[in-house]
């Protein structure tokens, strides 16, 4: 299978020292780190540092850091951005000049250039591991990392996991704490959280923000309802008929029995899709891959770079296949069963989800409008369409590395 290479060159061809090799992994030392070198400061031949300018800003380089020759300033900026999982926004057209005099003016474009010239996120994370903890195929740091202990996570999957805007265990507990019966307001708030988290997750994936804004909107417009169902299953969202009917606004005006029956049927279909995913006991890494496969679909209308979107989707599928093969060797059909669930997600149409969960919050405002506004704003949690109670903030942002 041909290797999928993204525009930041963090993935791979046939180089055995590369970080990610889809569906295969070379044995030996930690991928991406030359023998005898450390992840943060790559070993140089001899003791003399070559006279090379910083590949990011053009300042004097202090050596090779995280895969590329950079100055101390760009090295520190990149390390801080990756370790804290920071997300930036460009106020211009995402093509700001990055040089010695302008490098501090736009953090988004500076981080983008760091990645474009070849600095590697995974090298920062490997630098946090002790030599005794490092092992082939393990790219996640130990200690506070909530995904530690899963040795088959590829670098690609770890990027997807680190993009999650919430700690999975805490988020799941939050969904389950009122599992007996959730009120209308709780259901609407939880639905908003699921939508927010889907958008924030997409914005935090390194290769999604680099797409043109119209492509980002097109992808989310096409996939938001499927991402919503996946998030609902992932957090075991309680789905009781009575409050869902109330949330859909069916109590507000007289209705025919046929309309009630139709909505109850929609709720049943939604419940079935969630329960089938829960029955597979999909783990966090698998959910991240499935969401990436769903998000990066070339079926979205008006894409300017269909081939690039297809390559990311192929990479997501390959990463999932490799992970399942290694993590679940006794379940040879698991990968196929996971993929077969994806077409069924579209059975739950986006208008149905809007009516069931969002009509009380936004009225007739189209979800597509909300998605666009979320992408344009600095944070999806600053939602202008719903009053947020001060004592119960909607924000569930999680920074795994602390402030």
UniProtKB/Swiss-Prot annotation:
Signal peptide: none annotated. Gene3D superfamilies: Erythroid Transcription Factor GATA-1, subunit A, Retinoid X Receptor. It is found in: Nucleus. One of its GO terms (cellular component) is nucleus. PROSITE patterns: NR_LBD, NUCLEAR_REC_DBD_1, NUCLEAR_REC_DBD_2. Belongs to the nuclear hormone receptor family. NR2 subfamily. Residues 152-378 form the NR LBD domain. One of its GO terms (molecular function) is zinc ion binding. It comes from Danio rerio (Zebrafish). Its main location: nucleus. GO terms for biological process: cell differentiation; cranial skeletal system development; nervous system development; regulation of transcription by RNA polymerase II; response to retinoic acid; visual perception. This is Nuclear receptor subfamily 2 group F member 5. Putative receptor that is required in photoreceptor cells precursors during eye development. Residues 16-44 are annotated as: Disordered. It comes from the Eukaryota. A zinc finger (NR C4-type) spans 54-74, 90-114.
């Amino acid at each position: 299978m041909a290797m999928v290479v993204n525009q930041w060159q963090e993935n791979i061809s046939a180089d055995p020292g590369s970080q990610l090799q889809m569906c295969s992994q070379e044995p030996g030392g930690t991928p991406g780190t030359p023998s005898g070198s450390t992840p943060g400061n790559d070993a140089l031949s001899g003791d003399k540092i070559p006279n090379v300018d910083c590949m990011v800003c053009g300042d004097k380089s202090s050596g090779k850091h995280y895969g590329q020759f950079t100055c101390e300033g760009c090295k520190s900026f990149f390390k801080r951005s990756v370790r804290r999982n920071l997300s930036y926004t460009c106020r211009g057209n995402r093509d700001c000049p990055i040089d010695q005099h302008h490098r501090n003016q736009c953090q988004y474009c500076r981080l983008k250039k760091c990645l474009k010239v070849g600095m590697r996120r995974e090298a920062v994370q490997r630098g946090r591991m002790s030599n005794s903890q490092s092992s082939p195929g393990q790219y996640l740091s130990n200690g506070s990392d909530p995904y530690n202990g899963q040795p088959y996570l590829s670098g690609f999957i770890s990027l997807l996991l680190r993009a999650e805007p919430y700690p999975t265990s805490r988020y799941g507990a939050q969904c389950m704490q009122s599992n007996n019966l959730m009120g209308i307001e709780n259901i609407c708030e939880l639905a908003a959280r699921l939508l927010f988290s889907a958008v924030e997750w997409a914005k935090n994936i390194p290769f999604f923000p680099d797409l043109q804004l119209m492509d980002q909107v097109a992808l989310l417009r096409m996939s938001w309802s499927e991402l919503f169902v996946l998030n609902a299953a992932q957090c075991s969202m309680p789905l009781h008929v009575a409050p869902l009917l109330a949330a859909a606004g069916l109590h507000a005006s007289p209705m025919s029995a046929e309309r009630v029956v139709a909505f109850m049927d929609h709720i049943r279909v939604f419940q079935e899709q969630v329960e089938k995913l829960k029955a597979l006991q999909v783990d966090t890494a698998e959910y991240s891959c499935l969401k990436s496969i769903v998000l990066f679909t070339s079926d979205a209308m008006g894409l300017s770079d269909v081939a690039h979107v297809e390559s990311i989707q192929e990479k997501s599928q390959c990463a999932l296949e490799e992970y399942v093969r290694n993590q679940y060797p006794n379940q040879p059909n698991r990968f196929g069963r996971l993929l077969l669930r994806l077409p069924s997600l579209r059975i739950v149409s986006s208008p149905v989800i809007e009516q069931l969960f969002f009509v009380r919050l936004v009225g007739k405002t189209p979800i597509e409008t909300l998605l666009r506004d979320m992408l344009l704003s600095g944070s999806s949690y600053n939602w202008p369409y719903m009053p947020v109670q001060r004592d119960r903030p909607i924000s569930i942002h999680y920074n795994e590395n602390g402030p």
